[in-house]
Amino acid sequence: MSFGIFHRILWLFLCANTLIVYLVTGSISDAVVTTMVGSLLLQLTYFANVLFLLWRAHCARRARQTTGQFHGEEQPGDPRIAGTHGRTDGDPCFEDEDSR
């Protein structure tokens, strides 16, 4: 999930949560507290998801390197550039403004 989509869902959830808690309890302080707790839980979940994706990418890269060693293949490019192995073709991060 991209950050933009997450950000919209976060704000939708927080506004709906605040409104519902206020309508049910009639207390602004309860609405603020539950909104802050919900915000914290959603942010922790997003952070855990990012860590999981990094771990999964690391495992996949390690598996590719291991199979390449068994077959005598070399990894192309610079492995210090994450995800590209040194190749910038097709990567939207390296596209020029004119090529879009």
Curated annotation (Swiss-Prot):
Primary location group: membrane
Subcellular location: Cell membrane
Disulfide bonds: none
Keywords: Cell membrane, Membrane, Nodulation, Plasmid, Transmembrane, Transmembrane helix
Presence of keyword Transmembrane: yes
Keyword Transmembrane: yes
TM regions (residue ranges): 9-29, 35-55
GO CC field: plasma membrane
Topology of the protein relative to the lipid bilayer: Multi-pass membrane protein
Region of interest called Disordered, as start-end residue ranges on this chain: 66-100
Family matches, as Pfam families: SyrA
Main function: Could be involved in the inhibition of exopolysaccharide synthesis (EPS) and nodulation ability (nod).
Family, similarity comment: To Rhizobium exopolysaccharide production repressor protein (ExoX).
Name the UniProt record assigns to this protein: Putative exopolysaccharide production repressor protein y4xQ
Organism: Sinorhizobium fredii (strain NBRC 101917 / NGR234)
